[in-house]
Amino acid sequence: FALAHMVNDFDILKSYLDEGANGVETDITFSDEGEPEYAFHGVPCDCKRWCRRTVGFNEYLQHVRDLSTPGNPKFREHFIAIVLDLKLNGLSQEALAHGGMRLADKLIAYYWAHGRNATRITFIVSVPKTSEKVFLKTFLEEIKAVGYDDMLSKVAFDFTDNGDFSETQKVFEGLGIHEHIWASDGITNCIPLLFRGTSRLEDLIRQRDVPGYKYISKVYAWTYDKETSVVKALELGVDGVMTNYADFVIGIINKPEHSSKYRLATYQDNPFEKFVKSA
């Protein structure tokens, strides 16, 4: 997966899809009461990026529905994944609970459109901290309560706090989430990867590859903009790279030394199937 980072309005979405990105990351902001309102990041953000792009969340979902529905004039065949980076900091537990329910409601109303149409997006619901787990609890409860359990086949889950994954696994177990987990590791592009290192990323990949282990389906790294970082991630065996330069990452994947081992994921690929790196 070549995941374009911080895609918060329609112009930048078109630009990244034109570059060939098969997935995007979009930042979702909430009211103090927990209502999902906008695609928006704000300052500070990654280096060399405009931080204030924005669009209403309802409009965003309707637009990506058009882009990901075969037969629609706007359909983009290669567009198959969206990471919803949920901006939950500062919300009370009550607001978090409301937010999870309302995110489910909005996906049903504006993306799945109160019906099981042929939309192709897998949503990765990305929560910043495990202490905000009630958001996922009410999200799951609401989808099941209104009879949309089957659409969970198009949903993955992630905590982005770069914490000890053994503790994260316990949180997933407590939520009754035993599959469809995308684990991630990363840091802003303003800080060189050299200073962060890849030890945690390597740990996640090793855990993913344990035979029979089900709590990590995919591992992605963020936000990688330098060739050395992208090549390192590919060599380690990541499933996705989040980047501010999607065409650059795709170009690296397509180089002869990498194209024999890697290709961009398509809709025919299972977003929850493990592809274990050969020894």
UniProtKB/Swiss-Prot annotation:
In which broad location class does this protein mainly occur, judging by the first location in its UniProt entry?
Answer: secreted
GO BP:
killing of cells of another organism; lipid catabolic process
Instruction: Report the superkingdom from the record.
Output: Eukaryota
Q: Where in the cell is it found?
A: Secreted
* Cysteines paired by S-S bonds: 45-51, 47-190
Which positions are tagged coiled coil? none
Q: Which cofactor does it need?
A: Mg(2+)
Cofactor comment text = Binds 1 Mg(2+) ion per subunit.
Please name the top-level EC class of this enzyme: lyase
Q: Give me the Gene Ontology terms describing cellular component.
A: extracellular region
What are the recorded GO MF terms, alphabetically? lyase activity; metal ion binding; phosphoric diester hydrolase activity; toxin activity
Tissue specificity, please? Expressed by the venom gland.
Task: State its Enzyme Commission number(s).
Answer: 4.6.1.-
Q: Where is the active site?
A: 5, 41 (nucleophile)
InterPro entries documented for this protein: PLC-like_Pdiesterase_TIM-brl
Give the binding site residues for Mg(2+).
25, 27, 85
Briefly, what is this protein's role? Dermonecrotic toxins cleave the phosphodiester linkage between the phosphate and headgroup of certain phospholipids (sphingolipid and lysolipid substrates), forming an alcohol (often choline) and a cyclic phosphate. This toxin acts on sphingomyelin (SM). It may also act on ceramide phosphoethanolamine (CPE), lysophosphatidylcholine (LPC) and lysophosphatidylethanolamine (LPE), but not on lysophosphatidylserine (LPS), and lysophosphatidylglycerol (LPG). It acts by transphosphatidylation, releasing exclusively cyclic phosphate products as second products.
The protein's name in its UniProt record: Dermonecrotic toxin LspiSicTox-betaIE3ii
Q: Tell me what organism the protein belongs to.
A: Loxosceles spinulosa (Recluse spider)
